[in-house]
Curated annotation (Swiss-Prot):
GO terms for molecular function: rRNA (cytosine-N4-)-methyltransferase activity. This is Ribosomal RNA small subunit methyltransferase H. It comes from Anaeromyxobacter sp. (strain K). It catalyses: cytidine(1402) in 16S rRNA + S-adenosyl-L-methionine = N(4)-methylcytidine(1402) in 16S rRNA + S-adenosyl-L-homocysteine + H(+). InterPro entries: RsmH (IPR002903), SAM-dep_MeTrfase_MraW_recog (IPR023397), SAM-dependent_MTases_sf (IPR029063). GO terms for cellular component: cytoplasm. Belongs to the methyltransferase superfamily. RsmH family. GO terms for biological process: rRNA base methylation. Transmembrane segments: none annotated.
Length: 310
């Protein structure tokens, strides 16, 4: 089945308001996906370099945005490598940078990608088509490490029994698919503790997806690279969908906008450091009730933005 990567960009109006794209400016979209946010920037007259490691998403969005001609360029790459991509293209800096850390609906819904717990699919979960699959990961790590992943990345309160059940099923059942994996996870969680609004395997699947794709490592690399990617006056925005990502963005943006680096017990600043970034959003921007009604997945979206001063 071929995926349709068309999607409505989350927090579209807010992105335009915060990034303020102007004709001729150059933006870096680190997560092209369906091309929704890139399309917004291009419609405003900006130029866009967009990254994605999913070849199918890349091809679909490139075809959809072809009408913008040379103003749009797509590169197959992980957004963690944004700085290296720009250097390879001979670009010193951009006027704005954006990442949308959500998983696209086609990736979630297409069973053969291995993200769905409602339909059987292979234990894959890779955003692209290279690297370690979910099955590779589950066979490589031990029960203790699996429990850590579920606890830290999925905030799963029953991480230990879930990890134990998953490792046992992996050894005794072959082949194990995503639908059966979801059943195993649900069976390891007491029925009275099942979440009310989501499938009991949701936290586990989130944690495993993050681990397979090293999503937090990619985000950390993107955040660390911002000072070397943005031109003075350039703005960066990040849309996150769970607390781990939002916490990382919040803490990094706070560090970038902090001037003094002296120990807190010093009565007077001795370092003389000046902040290189300014916060644009004082707190995370959330989707409106109208947008959530139109696009329920926007409910958990959190947007933060900063501007480079010098």
């Amino acid at each position: 089945m071929s995926a349709d990567f068309r999607h409505e960009p989350v927090l579209a109006n807010e992105i335009l308001e915060l990034l303020r794209p102007r004709p001729g400016e150059l933006f870096l979209d680190g997560t092209l996906g369906g091309g929704g946010h890139s399309g917004l920037l291009l419609e405003a007259g900006a130029r866009v370099i967009a990254l994605d490691k999913d070849p199918r998403a890349l091809a679909a969005a490139t075809a959809r945005l072809a009408r913008f001609g040379e103003a749009f360029r797509a590169v197959r790459s992980d957004f963690r490598d944004a700085k290296n991509v720009l250097q390879a293209l001979g670009i010193a800096a951009v006027d704005g940078a954006l990442v949308d850390l959500g998983v696209s609906s086609p990736q979630l819904d297409e069973a053969e990608r291995g993200f769905s717990f409602s339909r059987p699919g292979p234990l894959d979960m890779r955003m692209g088509d290279t690297g370690e699959t979910l099955e590779d990961l589950l066979r490589r790590i031990d029960e203790r490490e699996l429990a850590r992943i579920l606890r830290e990345y999925g905030e799963e309160p029953f991480a230990r029994p879930v990890a134990r059940a998953v490792k046992a099923a992996l050894e005794t059942e072959a082949p194990l698919d995503t639908a059966r994996l979801a059943e195993v996870v649900a069976g390891a969680i007491p029925r009275k503790a099942w979440p009310h609004r989501i499938h009991p395997a949701t936290r586990t699947f989130q944690a495993l997806r993050i681990a397979v794709n090293d999503e937090l490592g990619a985000l950390a690399a993107w955040l660390d690279g911002l000072p070397g990617v943005l031109a003075p006056g350039g703005r960066a925005a990040a849309i996150s969908f769970h607390s781990l990502e939002d916490r990382m963005v919040k803490e990094k943006f706070r560090a970038l906008t902090q001037a003094c680096t002296c120990p807190p017990d010093l009565p007077v600043c001795a370092c003389g450091a000046k902040a290189s970034f300014a916060a644009i959003t004082r707190k995370a921007v959330k989707a409106s009730d109208e947008e959530i009604a139109r696009n329920p997945r926007a409910r958990s979206a959190r947007l933060r933005a900063v501007e480079k001063l010098r």
